[in-house]
């Protein structure tokens, strides 16, 4: 079915974080027969001979050199990734870009590009236009201190000292939606436009940056856990994807290639460890009980217009050529990310999942719902409550019998196959305690909550593409610059998508890191392609291929499609989720 894209896409389709880790599970079955070519790696998989063929990295020819960057005094050329290396294949030994020093013509300088008329003070180096009354006020309103030069005596900007909002610098950074990394600063959250109006939060004086519409502290959430139970792996994946999609939205203007690959930070060990355990549990005989606790401590909202850009980002945009060159525009996204954060809820959350052996649970005579209810009681009273009589409507008068079966710490009983914890916010010590193979106690939860106040993480956020920061106020050629940035974003996301990797075996997840693909294997599986195991066969979940080429423009729109064959679902695995065909506006 053909769907018209909406301007805002849920993070389930853009930033799936841990949910996508549970969903896009890949398979490559390369059966060995006859003579094996050189470089093929052999392995055993439940008595079946399999082979993984190395794939070498291939890059395109070099582009021509760009013009000399007048600000950086460098010029660039690039090569695009044609085929990433995988399964031990030969890597690419170049980074896909080359930079060399150059001398721009003397008639050009870093602020030469045409700028809109400034009716205030035009900053010497950054080219920023600020109100004339900001001169000699003690603030670095220009980003280069030029508005303070020549002042007889530089006073303090404000008579009273004020604190800076927690996490304000991270909120000024761009974010790369391919892997959720924060990159260089794109807006200037230390620009105040001369304002010294105090903003008091719990008797603490803060100074509000110009770009902010709202920054409030709010204590929402408790140390109580919300529990959900799932009879099967597919139910668990569907719920997790839907629940996480409500937490973050990413506006992109067009759909993303390999949409479900986005948002998961594969370099983060806490996610990769949980990923391996969950994928191992994709067999039909597993059930799941998941618990979550969330603390919301602050809310951040940007102004909707007239944002003050960070001076370095501002100069980089000014130095881009008006004629489109993918190499230079791609470098912007590598250095500053693809999006900026317009709204965010900050705090911390703790999520754990108990993976149960369904057959052993059924043999105890208790239901999955009974297990969930008893686990809720364990959490409310604070861990080892074996022998404590609590009525929860179970036949037999309480949880005593089931707690004996569950084990003293609930997650160590014979019916528990594994336990997965992912904690965000707080400090490393509290996170280490919480992620241990024990249910969290109320004292540990309080300790973690106190640490979250000093190390906030993103709980929910809304982002917009970087090109929306380009306005006619700052750029005389805003329309063409925005058009080029939007075009480059589409190319960059397509070039960098993990859908370009060959599928891994046994629900391993193929991840594109630079120019090479790696397989994140479920627990109990190993090898370059997750091909080595003594475990029985499991259902293989489907994953999307890359998007095909766009159709010719018809009117003002064009379409493209993709297939659920990378790999196709088999043996009862989950089908691909999301659109098979999409429509977007023509550039």
Curated annotation (Swiss-Prot):
Protein name: Complement component C8 beta chain
Domain LDL-receptor class A as annotated: residue spans: 117-159
GO cellular component, one term: membrane attack complex
Function: Component of the membrane attack complex (MAC), a multiprotein complex activated by the complement cascade, which inserts into a target cell membrane and forms a pore, leading to target cell membrane rupture and cell lysis. The MAC is initiated by proteolytic cleavage of C5 into complement C5b in response to the classical, alternative, lectin and GZMK complement pathways. The complement pathways consist in a cascade of proteins that leads to phagocytosis and breakdown of pathogens and signaling that strengthens the adaptive immune system.
Signal peptide extent: 1-31
Domain TSP type-1 intervals: 56-111, 541-587
Disulfide bonds: 57-92, 68-102, 71-110, 118-129, 123-142, 158-196, 374-399, 499-546, 501-517, 504-519, 521-530, 553-586
InterPro entries assigned to the protein according to its UniProt record, in alphabetical order: C8A_B_C6_EGF-like (IPR048831), LDL_receptor-like_sf (IPR036055), LDrepeatLR_classA_rpt (IPR002172), MAC_perforin (IPR001862), MACPF (IPR020864), MACPF_CS (IPR020863), TSP1_rpt (IPR000884), TSP1_rpt_sf (IPR036383)
Membrane topology: Multi-pass membrane protein
Annotated PROSITE patterns: EGF_1, EGF_2, LDLRA_2, MACPF_1, MACPF_2, TSP1
EGF-like domain sequence ranges: 501-531
Organism taxonomic ancestry: Eukaryota, Metazoa, Chordata, Craniata, Vertebrata
GO biological process, one term: complement activation, classical pathway
Keywords, alphabetical: Calcium, Complement alternate pathway, Complement pathway, Cytolysis, Disulfide bond, EGF-like domain, Glycoprotein, Immunity, Innate immunity, Membrane, Membrane attack complex, Metal-binding, Repeat, Secreted, Signal, Target cell membrane, Target membrane, Transmembrane, Transmembrane beta strand
Residues that carry a glycan: 62, 65, 547, 550
Ranges that cross the membrane: 248-255, 258-265, 375-382, 388-395
This protein's record includes keyword Disulfide bond: yes
Ranges of residues in domain MACPF: 154-500
């Amino acid at each position: 079915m053909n769907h018209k894209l909406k301007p805002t896409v849920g993070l389930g389709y853009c930033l799936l974080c841990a949910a996508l880790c549970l969903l896009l599970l890949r398979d490559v079955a390369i059966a060995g027969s006859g003579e094996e070519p050189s470089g093929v790696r052999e392995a055993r998989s439940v008595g079946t001979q399999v082979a993984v063929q190395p794939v070498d990295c291939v890059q395109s020819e070099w582009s021509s050199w760009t013009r000399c960057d007048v600000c950086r005094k460098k010029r660039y050329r690039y090569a695009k990734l044609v085929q990433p290396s995988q399964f031990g294949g030969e890597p690419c030994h170049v980074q896909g870009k080359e930079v060399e020093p150059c001398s721009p013509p003397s008639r050009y300088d870093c602020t030469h590009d045409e700028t809109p008329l400034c009716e205030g003070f035009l900053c010497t180096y950054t080219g920023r236009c600020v109100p004339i009354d900001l001169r000699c006020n003690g603030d670095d309103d220009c980003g280069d201190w030029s508005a303070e030069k020549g002042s007889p005596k530089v006073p303090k900007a404000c008579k009273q000292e004020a604190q800076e909002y927690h996490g304000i610098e991270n909120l000024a950074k761009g974010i790369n939606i391919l892997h959720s990394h924060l990159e260089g600063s794109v807006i200037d959250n230390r620009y105040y436009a001369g304002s010294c109006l105090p903003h008091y939060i719990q008797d603490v004086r803060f100074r509000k940056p110009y770009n902010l519409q709202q920054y409030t502290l709010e204590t929402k959430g408790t140390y109580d856990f919300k529990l959900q139970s799932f009879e099967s792996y597919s139910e668990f994946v569907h719920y997790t994807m839907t629940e996480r999609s409500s937490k973050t939205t990413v506006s992109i203007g067009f759909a993303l290639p390999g949409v479900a690959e986005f948002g998961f930070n594969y370099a983060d060990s806490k996610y990769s460890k949980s990923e391996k355990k969950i994928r191992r549990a994709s067999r039909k005989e597993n059930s799941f009980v998941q618990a979550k606790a969330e603390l919301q401590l602050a809310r951040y909202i940007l102004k909707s217009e007239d944002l003050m850009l960070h001076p370095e980002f501002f100069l980089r945009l000014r130095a881009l050529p008006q004629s489109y060159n993918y190499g230079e525009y791609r470098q912007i996204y590598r250095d500053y990310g693809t999006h900026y954060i317009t709204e965010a809820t900050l705090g911390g959350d703790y999520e754990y999942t108990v993976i149960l052996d369904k057959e052993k649970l059924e043999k105890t005579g208790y239901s999955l719902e009974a297990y969930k209810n008893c686990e809720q009681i364990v959490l409310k009273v604070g861990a080892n409550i074996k022998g404590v009589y609590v009525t929860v409507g179970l036949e037999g008068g309480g949880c005593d019998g089931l707690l004996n079966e569950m084990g003293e710490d609930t997650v160590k009983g014979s019916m528990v196959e594994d336990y997965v914890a992912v904690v965000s916010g707080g400090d490393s010590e509290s996170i280490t305690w919480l992620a241990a193979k024990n249910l969290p106690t109320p004292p540990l939860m309080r300790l973690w909550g106190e640490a979250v106040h000093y190390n906030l993480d993103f709980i929910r956020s809304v982002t917009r593409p970087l090109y929306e920061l380009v306005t006619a106020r700052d750029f005389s050629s805003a329309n063409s610059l925005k058009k080029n940035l939007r075009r480059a974003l589409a190319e960059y996301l397509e070039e960098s998508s993990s859908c370009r990797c060959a599928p891994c075996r046994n629900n391993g997840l193929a991840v594109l890191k630079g120019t090479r693909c790696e397989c994140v294997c479920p627990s109990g599986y190993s090898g370059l392609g997750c091909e080595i195991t003594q475990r029985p066969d499991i259902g293989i979940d489907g994953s999307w291929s890359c998007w095909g080429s766009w159709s010719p423009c018809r009117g003002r729109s064009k379409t493209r499609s993709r297939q659920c064959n990378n790999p196709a679902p088999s043996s009862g695995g989950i089908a691909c989720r999301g659109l098979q065909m999409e429509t977007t506006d023509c550039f």
